[in-house]
Amino acid sequence: CMGIDFLVSADWHIRGDRPVCRTDDYMEAQQKKIEFISNLAGFHDCPILVAGDFGHRPMWGDRLLNWFISRNSKVERPHIIAICGQHDLPNHRLDKWEEAGVGVLSKSIENFEVAHNDFNYDNRIQIHTYPYGEKIQCFTESARKINIAMVHQMVIKSQDDKLWHDQKADHAKRLLRKFPCYDYILSGDNHQSFVVEHEGRYLINAGSLMRMSANQIGDLPSVYSVDIRKNSVERVYLPIEKDVISREHIDVAKKRDDRIDSFVNRLNESYDIDFDFEKNLEEFFTKNKVNEKTK
C-alpha cells in the first residue's frame, strides 16, 4: 500500500443536473474530481471509503447511470466502499437501497461496493458500517486490530462550529470519547472538511466532493489519506477551478425579497388593519363608490 492504507471521502452527491450556483460544465467537474481520487488510490493501491450520500437523489436515471458506469467501471479502478446516506435511499428506507442508483452501481461495477454489514477488509482492518438511520455503537467483538466506523450522521467539529444557531448534533470529540473502541470514525453528511484527534484516535469528516451551494465558495474539497502504521492522517486537496460559483441567484432572490418587504410596508402604512368586520366594511364603503343596492 506504499504507506497509505485507505482514502476517506464522503458526500459525492453525483448528479446529472447543474446546481443553481455553478456556471461551469458540472458533469465534467465531477469527473475530474473522481479521476483525481481514483488515480491517487490507484497509485497507493488502496480503497476509497465514502461515508454516505454517494448520489444526490435515490433514483439516478438511465442517462446519469450510463455516464457514471461507462467512465468508472474499468477493471483497474480502485475499490470504492460506500455506505448509504439519506440521499441514496428511496423514502429514506435502508431496506430499499438495492432499488436505488447505488444498487445499480453495486451490480454493474465490480469494484464498487455498498457496505451494509460489518466486515473484515483485510487481516488488520474490520469496518463497521452505520448507514443513514443506524446509530453508531460499540461492537461486542472484533477479530481485527484496527477498527473503523463508517457513519452517515451530522457531526460538527466542535460545539463552537454549529451550522446554525440552535443546531443539535454530536461533535467530533464527543463521539471519539463515547466510542473508544474505534481507531477511526469516518463521518458523512456535514459538507465541511475537518479531522479531530483524541488520544491517538481520529474522527475524519471529509466533506463534500463538490461545492454545490454559493456558501461553499471558500471551501477546499478534499480527501484524507490514512497511514495506519504511522497513525497519520493527511489532507489532500482536490483540484478546483476559480470563478465557477455565482451568487447571482442569491442576489436576485434578495432583491425580490426586498421588493416584497417594501410592498408590505407600504400596505401597512396605507391601511390600519382592523379585525372589526363591520368597521372594515364601513371604511371600504366610505373610500370607494358603492351603490346602495350592493350595500
Predicted regions and their residues:
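Non-catalytic terminal accessory segments
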Residues: 1, 233-234, 241-295
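Core catalytic region of metal-dependent phosphoesterases/phosphodiesterases
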Residues: 3, 12, 19-118
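Active-site neighborhood of phospho(di)ester-bond hydrolases with catalytic His/Asp-centered motifs
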Residues: 8-10, 48-53, 79-87, 113-117, ...
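Short, glycine/acidic-enriched loop or turn micro-motifs at the edges of active sites
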Residues: 14, 56, 155, 192, ...
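Catalytic phosphate/metal-binding cores of nucleic-acid and nucleotide-processing enzymes, i.e., regions
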Residues: 15-17, 21, 35, 68-78, ...
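Cap/insert and terminal regions of metallo-dependent hydrolase folds
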Residues: 25-37, 184, 213, 217-219, ...
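Conserved catalytic scaffold of divalent metal-dependent phosphoesterases
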Residues: 67-68, 73-74, 81-175
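Conserved beta-sheet core of the metallophosphoesterase superfamily
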Residues: 163-230, 235
